[in-house]
Amino acid sequence: ESIPMKSLRCYNDYNSQVTCTWMEHSEAHDLLGMTLYQRNNIIMENKDMFCKRQTEKDLQKTPDAYVHWVCRNTRESFGIGVDFFYGFRPKKVLQAGLDVDLFQNVQPLPPQNLSVSLMTSGDFLLTWKTVDGGQELGNALEFEVTYKREWESWEGAASLLLPSTTHCSLSREGLVPGSSYVARVRARPGQASGFSGHYSEWSTEVSWKTPGGSVEWSGAMQGWMLRSQNFPVPYLAPVLSEGGLQPRNLRCLFTGGDRLTCSWEVKKVITTSVLFGLFFRATPASAEEECSPVHEKTLTHTPYVVQSCEIPVSNSSSQRHYHVSVRAKTEEKHIEAYKNIQVQPPANVSVTATENHEYELSWIKHNLSYSFITQRYQVKYWENNQYEKVTYKVQES
């Protein structure tokens, strides 16, 4: 839930007036601003509520990072069976859209099970497996293998480009004896395959040590190991939107199998007031669907967060063109009027001395929509200027 929806509290006098209070982050208010609306199940029309900003004096509290609101509206009908719904609408339209051709936006999953073994020739054999991305794509991948000594940087690593294979050999003549090496591999659609897109992320690394001098291979290879390391996703050309409010850098990548992963960036402070959703159509005539769940990752040193969602792909050969859009979702809350009554305070309170030296307190009560609903009163009184000595009495009518 957003902060406005989480903080929303609404009550009514069960006669004509509805009052709501809520808050939003002050920076989100300055950038965007939200409008509270109300609807019931009889009229079924959203009606904006009249809202007034509350001051620190109104709240009797110190300033904080939020803007507090009190909103009011009048209604003619209350009762069990009359349902009230409340929601927030941003004062600006927030959305971004993209047409996606699956076969032109491929990013394979990283190769798995990378391993190294010593051949009888003394060369080293690297092998790996591809993750199922569909038979067509699986036969159309090319691979990049990079390897280096452990202490060297990847920028200076040796690189091999290999079309449609899941192994390669490294000649012992090209390796320094008695050195520790590390290798990794990634995949991309082959240039002549009819697919296009981007490299996968790198596989996990594999490490080994070359024999040195008279050292036997069996001893030198003891303890070669696999280790995991995360590598940055290669840069992709962004779809940018004007202004700092709109979702930006919307992009979608197809694994070649059964998933289309879309991601976008939004200002973090705006997400305190608005929840963004990803919506898609597999064909122009199909009904729009919402992708779920949406994941979020914070970016360091930037006011933006990355949100993402995976769209299931059932038949990429017959449905390869998708339209996706990111926009603010509609949040609504059902608040039952008869369970959230706050009666208007009694009017014309007066005190009368009785003949037996007692005092009688009287007032005019606030009428509810239904006369059979009883009201319970709390009377509070004290000696003049002695508020700490308070006495309560409770009475029903």
Predicted feature residues:
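Beta-strand-rich modules
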Residues: 61-99, 168-196, 304-337, 396-397
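An aromatic-rich alpha-helical recognition segment common to small helix-rich domains
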Residues: 22, 88, 111, 126-128, ...
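Solvent-exposed loop/turn segments flanking beta-strands in beta-repeat/beta-sandwich domains
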Residues: 6, 25-47, 131-151, 248, ...
